[in-house]
Structures are given as C-alpha cells and as structure tokens.
Amino acid sequence: MENLRRAVHPNKDNSRRVEHILKLWVIEAKDLPAKKKYLCELCLDDVLYARTTGKLKTDNVFWGEHFEFHNLPPLRTVTVHLYRETDKKKKKERNSYLGLVSLPAASVAGRQFVEKWYPVVTPNPKGGKGPGPMIRIKARYQTITILPMEMYKEFAEHITNHYLGLCAALEPILSAKTKEEMASALVHILQSTGKVKDFLTDLMMSEVDRCGDNEHLIFRENTLATKAIEEYLKLVGQKYLQDALGEFIKALYESDENCEVDPSKCSAADLPEHQGNLKMCCELAFCKIINSYCVFPRELKEVFASWRQECSSRGRPDISERLISASLFLRFLCPAIMSPSLFNLLQEYPDDRTARTLTLIAKVTQNLANFAKFGSKEEYMSFMNQFLEHEWTNMQRFLLEISNPETLSNTAGFEGYIDLGRELSSLHSLLWEAVSQLDQSIVSKLGPLPRILRDVHTALSTPGSGQLPGTNDLASTPGSGSSSVSAGLQKMVIENDLSGLIDFTRLPSPTPENKDLFFVTRSSGVQPSPARSSSYSEANEPDLQMANGSKSLSMVDLQDARTLDGEAGSPVGPEALPADGQVPATQLVAGWPARAAPVSLAGLATVRRAVPTPTTPGTSEGAPGRPQLLAPLSFQNPVYQMAAGLPLSPRGLGDSGSEGHSSLSSHSNSEELAAAAKLGSFSTAAEELARRPGELARRQMSLTEKGGQPTVPRQNSAGPQRRIDQPPPPPPPPPPAPRGRTPPTMLSTLQYPRPSSGTLASASPDWAGPGTRLRQQSSSSKGDSPELKPRALHKQGPSPVSPNALDRTAAWLLTMNAQLLEDEGLGPDPPHRDRLRSKEELSQAEKDLAVLQDKLRISTKKLEEYETLFKCQEETTQKLVLEYQARLEEGEERLRRQQEDKDVQMKGIISRLMSVEEELKKDHAEMQAAVDSKQKIIDAQEKRIASLDAANARLMSALTQLKERYSMRARNGVSPTNPTKLQITENGEFRNSSNC
C-alpha cells in the first residue's frame, strides 16, 4: 500500500505535507429493544470505511471495537450509523436502519481523546416516550504537519545519539498517556535509524538500577522503559503473535467450552468437568507458545540476547530471565490472550464466557512465566499447580531459546513500514510541550535540543519554509534564454526509460541490513559546514570499482541547490555575461583548462548551472573567506570521479542541455588538448573575433544546421521500474563500438543518482543507434578551489573516451574562424601566406597520420577495455546467479526447517492428546474393574437372599403342618403321650423323630 502511495506522491518525504489521522472506539449503546442484534457502520464524509460486528442486546449492547485510519483526506464529519441485524427467516422485517450519530471532526480534534454518550438521531422520532437510544464513542482526530526530511535531520540525529539523557530528564513530569505516545515515537524513529536495540538495552538497564533488589517491580510501573518495550513488541511481534496464538484464540471464540472453576460461580457437579476443560486449554496454549520459537522475530531475539549479555557483564545473570519473561508475557502475550481485539488478533470483543476463559488462561500462563504457584488468594486455581511445576523446565528452555544469539539467522526480520517524517513530527510536538514545563536548570542539561526544537517549530509556523528548493519545478528558470531548451530536456529525460535506476522514494522500511540508508552523515572536506548525503549500497547490484575505490553511489544530496549556485560570488547565466553575450576563454580557465577560444552565449547557456564558471579572473581563484563550491551532489560522489562520460547531476539537469546539442564535458582526450595548445598563435584573431559576435554566432548556427547532432529519440517511460529490493536485470552484451562514441555498456551498469526531489526526471543515458550521439553531461566541479585543481586535472587527464560533439565543434569552429580572419586580411601578411600554407599542409598531413595512429591505438585499447568489461559483467552476472541460487537454497532450507518444526509441534500435540487418551482409558478400565467386582458381590448376595427366602418358606409350611396335626389330635381327645420332636436337618428340612 505504501508503494502505491509513493507512486502517486513520489516526492512525499522531500516536501511539506499534512497527515490526517482518526482513532475511534465504538464502545456501547443503550436504550435499545432487547433480544436483537445490533451493528454500526462508520462513515467519513459519507464514505463507508468500517463496520462493527453484530452484538446481542443484554443490559447494553457492548461492541468495544476500535478503528484507526491514516492518510485520510481532510475530514468534516464522522458519522456512525446504527442498524439492527435482520432475521433472514422473517421476510417482512425489511427496515433495519435505526438512526445515526454525527460528529463534527473539529469537535474531536486535538491530542486528547473525547469520550461521550451521543444521542442517536432516528428517522422517525417518537416524542414523549422517554430518551432515545444513545451510543458511547471515544474519538480523536489529528492533523499533523510534516516538514521535509531535511528539516528533521539534526533533530533525528540528536534523538538517535542522546535518547538516554532525554528520557531521564522528562520521566518525572510526563503523564502515563504522554509516556506512551513518546515511547511509541522514539521506538519507531530508532527502529528506522537502527538504534532501537541499544535504546531498549540502555532503558532496561536503567530500569534494573532503579528497581534495585525489588525485581518484582520491573515492568509493573508506567515508566518510559515499560511503554517502550510494550510498543516495540507490538511493532515487530504482530506477525509472530498471529502465528503463535491466532488460530488458538479463534478456536476459543468458536467453542462453547465452559472453563469456570470458581465454586461461587458454578455448581459442584460441573466443577470437575470445568477444571478438565481449563487444564486442556492451558496445555494447548502453552504448547503453542513454546513451539513458536521457530517463528520468533529476529529483532526481539537480538534485544533479548543483548539484555542477557548486559546482565551477565554486570554480574546479575539471574535477572535476565525475569526481564525477558516479564516483558514478553506480562506486557505482550498475556494481555493479547486477555484482549485479542486490542492486539488485532480478532476484531470482535469476546462474550462473557469466552472473556472469562481467556482471563483464566492468561492467569495460568502468567504464573508459569513467573515460576510461581497459586496460593490462598486464588485457592480455587490450586488444582493447576501440578501443571505449573511440570512445565517450568519447558518455560526455562523456551526463554533460553528466544535469547540465543546463535539462532538469529533462522528467523525473519521486521517487514513493516514506518513513516519516519510523521513520527518525527509527533515527537517534536510532544517534546515542544514537555520541555516548556521543565525548569531552566534541567533545560540547560539538554544541550542543543531546545534550539533544535525552536528551529523546527519556526519552520512549522512559517508556511512554505519547509519546501526544499530541489522540489521546485526543474524547468522554471525565469529570465533565461535557455528556459525552453531546459524544459525540452526535462521533458525528454522524464520520458526516458527509468528501469535502470534505484528508486530512492520506494525504498523499503529500514532493517538491520539497510538501516544505514537513513541519516548516514558524511562531512565534505571543502565545505565550511557539514554537508550530509543519504547513501545506500544495494547488495544485489554488481560491485563497480569506482575511480576512488568506493562502491557506494550517493543518490541524494541534501544541500540547497540555490545556495550552492549563489556562493560563487556572481551568478552564472545570461544576466551575468557581457552585453555581447560572449566571455573570453581566458576567463574560463578554472572551468575548462587548456581552452583559449571565446565561447558564445548559446554554448554557455547549455551549461549555465552545470558548470558555474566565474566571469572574472579574480573570481576564478575564489574569493578570500568565501566557501569554495562543490560539484553537483558534492564531490564525495564517486560517480563524478569515473573515467567515462557520466550523466549530469539531478540539480543541474533541469536547466542545462538541449535536445539538439550535447553538453560540455570536462574529459578531453590528448589530441584535443594538443590541438588546443597549438592554437595559441591565433590569440590576436581570437581577440578580434571576440569583438565580432554577430558573425561568429551566425557561422556557429550554420555549422549547427549542417553538422548538428540529431535529436535523441524519446523513450516511453511506461516500462517497468525496478525496485531496490528486486534483483537487477542481467546486463546486455556490448554492441560494436562506433567510432568516437562511448558504448552504452560503459554506462549501463552504473547506478545513476536519483533526484533529491524524488521526481522521475533522471539523467539516464540513451544509445539510439548509428544516427545519434550519446549525451555526455558535465561532471566538472563547480568553482574548484586552487587546492583542488591539480587533483582534478590529474583525475581528468587523458582518457580513452573520444571528445564529445561540442568539443570537436568548438575546435573546428576556432580553426574556421582563424581561416576566415586570414581571408579577410586579419591574419599574417599575404606574401607569406603561400609558404605558410605549404608548410601547414605538410605538417597537417603528418598530424593527420599521427592522429590516425593515435585513434587506432585508442580503438585497440577501447576494444581491450570493452572485452575486460564484458568479462567483468559476465563474472558479476555469474556471481549474482550463484548468490540467488544460494539464497534460494537457504530459503528452501529455512522452509524445510520450519516445516520440521511444525511437524515436531504437531507430533507434540498429538502425543499429548494420545497420552491424555491413554490416561482416560486407564481410568475407565480401573473404574470398570471396580464396578465388575462390586457386581459380583451383589450377585452373590442376591443368591444368598434367594436361598434364605426358600428356607423361610419351607419353615412356615412345616409349622403350619404341625399346627394342623396338633389341633386334630386335640379334637379327637387323644393326648399325646410322646410328643413329636422336630429336628432340622443340615439342608434346612424338618425331620419327625417320633416312633409313630
């Protein structure tokens, strides 16, 4: 998304801009009918931006959802529309719209959040029936003015180097909310500048020193250190959080498991089941966490490893484990488990049961991270103590793994985007307000910070002051006769193919690999004030050995173009030239050595700013006490120290050169220098010619019409633009080298400097074929100081590159003008003319032969150079292929290891589930055995009861028989002499023992 924005606004970082940010919470609604689901839609200036989830009405409708929008257009109103979710089964229920809440953007503008109950404006208000529905909304709308990055350079450098003293001075006076905002800005800025690891380590060690022996207080107070690590965890750990807990949290949202284990909130019969559910959920959560080490962010590993190393060096290695566990679990993982919507794991706020389950899981996880058991305060959780003790060793192993510096290469780095300008602007506004509240004694300890803040505040208060000169229209040069020519050149350059350029405006967010992209300061040896340039060396590009041994190309110069042009003492352009439009060549010696001919206005206008030559001999040596100038983009740029003709700097590009003429080149070959030296005999002719500008101009125009350079064909700019993080295309093989031209292969492998304004205009060279000539732009230094002249001449000595078209034209024009003066009687005396011509013809023939021999040697040398260059390109291409092959293999290996880690994780989960299943089976078997044994006892008792019942029945029948027999004898009057004796046998039967 950021790349799309930069495509629309490529000059964003180098121009003054305004950012609009809205943060809004839709919290809850009241006075709505019950047993319905309600949702809200968020519209900004009548454009739908977001929608809440549907929530069921209980006491109130609670959403608790937050939304954050950046890069907004200027807002007038924020509207929240309230809807009732329609039941799809009831077709008659069509009208689900209930009303709206309209907030003027100005009412919530500022740094503080505004939280209020807002009445819902309904389409059909019902008067006299009590208050209508209301929605509680918390919102903040900010308009942030952001200056160009150049304006924040000193501020950012000061923050990067003096953050510790700043935090110590501001800590006592800041509120908790301000600390949070300041810590967020500092973390984002230092992440961009590559100093965040040192920043967090220094803050943590100061926090350890402050707490002393009270280790339990670390990360439990609202300090800048706590807020900083919180923000850093959110910044680099968002993807890790999603990978580690995203699926688990989503599964909990969808499940209906009840994990309430508080006896006061659930029945005793359900308690064992709920305890089992909670234990299972905690096991799964911790299993997810300890197996997430393979996707743990590399930056966090580096920070934790730095903490462990620093604690060991201070003689307190035991506290490093507490630091790591407290920061990761207390400030990141456990809050994310409790409130997934705040950490963007899910949008919806959980219902009551899910929220309670998440809270209990977070309690167990936090106790596990603290290596503590549940006590009397939460006695109902004591059943989890066995689980905690069992997992302590795994927790220690996990903490050791995520702080092990030896496994840093196995994990990915931060891939997000940071708007550095916005963060610097936010930090400036916070510091501007905070520093004004400090005592003067404390302010004096902050060094240059108050002055830097005042400078930035002045730039913010002055509209238009933040616009860099390089961001203006490159073709807008008033009062210059070459304005149309410059405009044509700019148009031609914009339409050229830009696929070979490094696009500075589309660089990815800084990482440890490319963190030097931002604020890499290099001071120039010839500038009175430090001139810094942002540089970047791409690892994927072929290494080109520059003339000065450097392999890094400076892409943007942060110096003011108009300042450089104005420091020479006199402006360079048509308004600074004499009235006849000519400057004697003797006055141009600083810019073009070994030239002794007048230069017309038409030729000089093409290099008006590219070669700002002094117009008087006095100024050519540099005024005393006046700073000497540098070449465009400063002379540190190795692209200006190469032997071949190189493109003009972006600063001089917009108003130099034309479509029909080549720009001047300071690289002259040996024969041109020799020819120019031999023309000294025509000095009187040159002086006479200087007094006749009209005829010379006419002849030069006729010469241009006869042998002028054809216009270079324009190329469509719709070709693909390669980003810096993409591999470069393989270099094409060099075509046959035409006579007197620089082949494109000498320039095709160069990385041309990107314009500091971020526009698409570039100085990419074109090779249009036999009918065109290569544009060679000037690379001479602007107003070189006398000390730099010998070195510059040494670097720009004889070169195998042939002179460009304008150099050859100037030499030939000088010869033609001398011949013209001879014909008109201005040369030597006529009697000596014939003798002179014969000698000149002979010397000319010898000279032509020598020139041809030199050209042959030069051509042979060029051919050898091209062969060498082609071999170097082949080797470079082969190296790139091997490098990408190695990267591919490394990526495959990393994916394989990650897959293995995932497999191990799944196997661990499966083994845990199998062990749980085995335990359940074992418990079931034991219970079944107990039931079987009890059943056997019951069966035996039932048999015994049945036998007793049978014996009892027989006894009763025997008694009945005896009673009947006794009664019969009594009725017959017979008294028994010998009463019958009954005896019970062993089998329970009665036996009569009488003799009868």
UniProtKB/Swiss-Prot annotation:
Pfam families recorded: C2, DAB2P_C, RasGAP
Biased composition (Basic and acidic residues): 830-841
GO MF entries: 14-3-3 protein binding; death receptor binding; GTPase activator activity; identical protein binding; kinase binding; mitogen-activated protein kinase kinase binding; mitogen-activated protein kinase kinase kinase binding; phosphatidylinositol 3-kinase binding
UniProt keyword annotation of Membrane present: yes
Coiled-coil positions: 832-966
Record remark: domains: Exists in a closed inactive form by an intramolecular interaction between the N- and the C-terminal domains. The proline-rich motif is critical both for PI3K-AKT activity inhibition and MAP3K5 activation. The PH and C2 domains are necessary for the binding to phosphatidylinositol phosphate. The Ras-GAP domain is necessary for its tumor-suppressive function. The C2 and Ras-GAP domains constitutively bind to MAP3K5 and facilitate the release of 14-3-3 proteins from MAP3K5.
Protein known as: Disabled homolog 2-interacting protein
Classification of source organism: Eukaryota, Metazoa, Chordata, Craniata, Vertebrata
